[in-house]
Every structure is written in C-alpha cells, then in structure tokens.
C-alpha cells in the first residue's frame, strides 16, 4: 500500500538554514502573491477543501491574514442591478491558474517548465457546499475566465464578483501570535496575507491543505 505523505508548505522569507532571504528572492516574490484574495489550491484540478496555517515566527508589524465570506456575496448579489443573474451563472465553468494570478500581481517569475507543469484547470463559478447545501461564489485571484464566454467579458464579470465579495462582506482580520494555528474552509472563504516589511522582519508560516474529494466541475 502507498503511504499517505503529509506535505507542509513554508510561506516564509527565511530559508531552511534559518537565513533571511533577500527582498528580491523568487521565493519571497512568489509568496508575496498570497497578498491577493484567493482560495488555496483552486489552481489544482482537485482543489483543497481545508487549509491549516500555523505561525512559527511572526513579524513585529504586519504579516496578518484576512478572511471574507464568499457565500454571503452570492446571497446578496441581487442587491445591485446586475447584467447577469445568478441563474445565468449557476452552470458556468471557469479556468483557474496560479501562473495567471501571479503574472497579475508579481510579474513573470516562472520558467517554461513550471508553466507547462501548472496548466489551467476547470472549476465551477458557483459551488454547492456538500454539508450545508448552500451555494457560494468560487472565484478569487486564480480565476482567469469563463469557458465559452468572450474572455474579456468574463474577466469583467469575475472582477465584479471578486469586488462584490469584499464590498458586501465583513473582513475578519487575524493578527498572528507565534504558535497559533488557524484552519478554514476554502469552499466558502477567500483569504489574503496583509503584507509586512520583508526587508526588516522575518516571517515563517507552515501550511497544510486537505485535498477535496473531486474536481469542482464534477460535483
């Protein structure tokens, strides 16, 4: 039998030799992309359902994590005049890509092999939570476009959805203390890092994600 191997990602500006990385290090730049609203691993064919983040070393200022509810945004979508109704959107399939999201906020830091290894993947725009049976938007910064739509038209809509998630909801702000652990449901919640002075402070976070049960477009 194959052993289950737990994988822990380091979100950090400190290397494995405990040396602080320079501000322009590719790892630091890559992690800086986490400061935009996203759902963890939505760029994977089977996205994560749960994220577990623990603080090993925190900066004196900044370095927090914000959370926002994407279900409430869907429930209040009709509070404003909309070109597209929820009925228009309920069967939409989007493509997500970490290369797309990072190109938009950190620039092109990837080699050709990484781009080939991380192709666009399909995700539902509206997901039904398997336990609550309630729908929520599934967008965020990794969400590129809607399949079968004009690309720019769909990106305008995705921006409208992402903007409304923030405008409609209340942001829950978490300021970390060393040793704390927080977990959340990526099927309902978007999150982002708040940033910190990477040239001055050290930050070491360990993250584990729990894979979902299937690709969202098959749910």
Short names for language-model regions:
Residues 1-183, 187-219:
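Fe(II)/2-oxoglutarate oxygenase catalytic core
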């Amino acid at each position: 039998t194959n052993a289950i191997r737990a994988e822990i990602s380091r979100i950090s500006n400190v290397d494995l030799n405990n040396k602080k990385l320079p501000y322009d290090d590719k790892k630091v730049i890559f992690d800086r992309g986490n400061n935009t609203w996203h759902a963890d691993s939505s760029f994977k064919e089977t996205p994560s359902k749960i994220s577990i983040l623990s603080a090993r070393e925190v900066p004196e200022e900044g370095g927090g994590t914000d959370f926002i509810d994407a279900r409430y945004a869907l429930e209040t979508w009709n509070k404003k005049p909309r070109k597209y109704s929820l009925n228009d959107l309920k069967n939409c399939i989007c493509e997500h890509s970490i290369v797309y999201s990072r190109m938009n906020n950190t620039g092109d830091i990837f080699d050709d092999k990484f781009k080939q290894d991380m192709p666009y993947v399909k995700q539902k725009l509206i997901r039904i939570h398997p336990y609550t049976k309630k729908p929520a938007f599934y967008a965020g910064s990794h969400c590129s476009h809607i399949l079968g739509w004009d690309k720019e038209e769909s990106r305008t809509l995705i921006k409208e959805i992402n903007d409304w998630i923030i405008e409609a909801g209340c942001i829950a702000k978490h300021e970390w203390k060393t040793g704390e652990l927080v977990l959340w449901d990526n099927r309902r919640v978007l999150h982002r890092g708040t940033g910190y002075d990477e040239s001055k402070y050290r930050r070491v976070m360990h993250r584990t994600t729990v894979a979902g049960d299937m690709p969202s477009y098959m749910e």
